[in-house]
Amino acid sequence: MLMMFPLVGQAQASVVVVDSCDAYDQVTSALGIGNDKLDFTTYNGTFASVDVAASICTVELSASSGLEGILGSYLKTDTVGETLVIHFEEEVRSVGGFFFMVDKFQLPVIGILELELSDGTSFLTSLTEDGGFAGFISNTANIESLSLRGFGPSMFAAPAVSSLKFGVVPSPAGLALLGIAGVARRRRRSV
């Protein structure tokens, strides 16, 4: 289970924090944010970094020690005590995922998830031993990176991610096309 500080749905500095994948999907949909998803359960072995080109954004995952993929489970830092950095190349307005911390024996431990926005604002979320979903949605500032690091007992753990959702706000031209498509569909139904 994921414990959130601040708790579900609290808005601060135009950022909504959620601890449910369903809530994340509902809020991003209501704000017109188009989402994409990445699954890291297919990675196996060690990597200096991982660059993934998704349909709406390029995402880079890195750690100073490199990354290790555990097939069927997650992608984590190669060394305990490192910070897992997820960097977005394009203008991302929402990010959420299933995050957790594992020790050198691959056992889950508690940890802290930190989100850094492009304006320098940061938000913290506490992860329980089971990890869980954490989502952050901004309606004003772009999210450039997400850092997952361990504090306290989890300083001797490796941050991990199994899947990631992220979204962009459609451009005004994209919104206009969506509006035209909606009008065309409505006319077709009324005929």
Enumerate the predicted regions with their spans.
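A short, hydrophobic C-terminal helix/tail in secreted or cell-surface proteins
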Residues: 169-186
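Intrinsically disordered, low-complexity segments enriched in proline/serine/threonine
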Residues: 8, 110, 172-174
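Short stretches within intrinsically disordered, low-complexity N-terminal or propeptide regions
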Residues: 13, 136-137, 175, 186
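Surface-exposed, well-ordered secondary-structure segments
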Residues: 14-168
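Sec-dependent, cleavable N-terminal signal peptides
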Residues: 1-14
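Short, charged juxtamembrane terminal tails flanking transmembrane helices
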Residues: 188-191
